[in-house]
Structures are given as C-alpha cells and as structure tokens.
Amino acid sequence: HVVLYRSFGWEESMPYFAHLPLVLKPDGNGKLSKRDGDRLGFPVFPLEWTDPVSHETSRGYNDYGFLPEAFINMLALLGWNPGHDKELMDLEELISLFSIERIGKSGAKFDWEKAKWFNHQYLQAMSTEQLALCMQADLEKNGVKADPAYVKKVCGLVRERAFLIPDLWANSWFLFRAPEKYDEQAVKKVWSPETPALIRSFAGEAASVTVWTQDHIHTLVQDFVTRNGIRTGQLMTPLRILVVGSTQGPGMMEIAELIGKEEFLSRVKSGLDRLARI
C-alpha cells in the first residue's frame, strides 16, 4: 500500500498503515484458511460466502449462531491485548482501550472452543426475553408456535447449555413436542421386564395429584421409590426416556412442571405403547 501511495505521489495524504498479526491455525502451524475451517468444522468468514469460481458456499459465524458482539470481542483479542486480564468487553470499551502499541508481533492461534466460550458468556448475560427472540428463527423453521411467556421459561431452563444460538433449540425441542423415537441403547440399558408396570403405577399416582410443581413432583417421586424399595434412577431414567426420548436434558422435575401434567402423562402412555411394540 505504501508503494502505491508513493508511486502516485500521494505521500502527503498517505494514512498510517499497520498490519495486524496473522490468525494462525489452531496448532499454530501456518495461517488459518478456509480449508482449515472445512476440515476442522468451524467458520472462517463472518457471513455466508459463495466462491465465485467454484460456487461453493461456506457458512459464516452469523450462520453458526454467533452474536455480533461476541464475535467482535473474540476477534479483537486475537493479536492484541488490553493490558489486563479481563476478556469480556463491549465494543465501546474495546475502542477506548485499543492502542497500536499493544498489538503483538507474532501470529495468534485461533481457538474454536474459546470462540464458543465467548459466545456462551454473551448468551448467559442476555435476558430470557432476548434469548427467546434469538430462538424465534429455529421455532419457525421447525413449525413451532408457542406462547412467548412459555418460550422465555424454556430459554431460562436451557440457557446454560447454549454456546451457539441453535443450541437453544437443540437442547429444548422436547419441551415443544413429544419425541417420535427413543434412544435404543438407553432403553436396552435401563429397561427391565418390571419397568412398564412400575411406570404405569407411578403414572396412576401422578394422575391423581392436584398440584404439579417441582417440589410436589419431587415429593411424589421420593414417596413412590421408598414405598416400592427401588432406586430413584430405576424410575426417573425410564421416565426421562419416555418424556424426552433420551437420557439427556435438564432436570426431570423441571421438565415435568414446564410441560404440564397432562402432557407428561400423555408422553408416558404413548411411549410405553410404542416401546411395547418394539
């Protein structure tokens, strides 16, 4: 750039130039490229980009579910340091602290897990109302119409598991619709000939309760397992599979309260009927 300015005789109006350090591959061997992103499973462009020659489309950070402010924060700290250990800074603070003198001379290794950590921190700082707005696109894509107040409750329940925006849906879809299939390996591991009768007995008792809150459900479960001389997991793990489809997810008491008693019992009955046919 300097040579171009000089060749055109524009030296008097030439701005000061400074080169930021290269962003290196995660192992530090060479500069980061699109090929590295494709190979290692992360984006290298801020937005979706289509190669004009190959017509190959690459998803960007925006498409992966990064918040703009998290992306900027992460990128600013590649090759530059603010002079202290604080990592989370908004754009205004980054601008106020920036100085050429603190730009490093060596390349900066890109860390995908660290990039997701930044996004996770920003997601945790958002209100449930803001998270619900972030989740709206995934709800629409999956044909889900839900009460905004319910969506906010869902976001509050799964927010700690979300590192990228799509994680909100990935960790909560079962709070909007019943599972259509069940984790076969999980079923084989916890199911026994006595399990269906045990579950039906608990469901019968659950159907008779009038108050359906986490505390009341917890008391119901503890009373049941004590009277039947079983471990809590012998009841709760099969119930989780029937209600969620797998052994993953937030606490079962929280799930049960959120989806409501009728939906809970409906899923239990439907799941038992389906598994009986397998």
Segments and roles (model prediction):
Residues H1-F8:
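Short active-site loop/helix that positions an aromatic residue
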Residues A186-V243, Q248:
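C-terminal accessory/binding modules appended to enzymatic or scaffolding proteins
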Residues H1, F71, M135, L220-V221:
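Generic structural signal for hydrophobic residues
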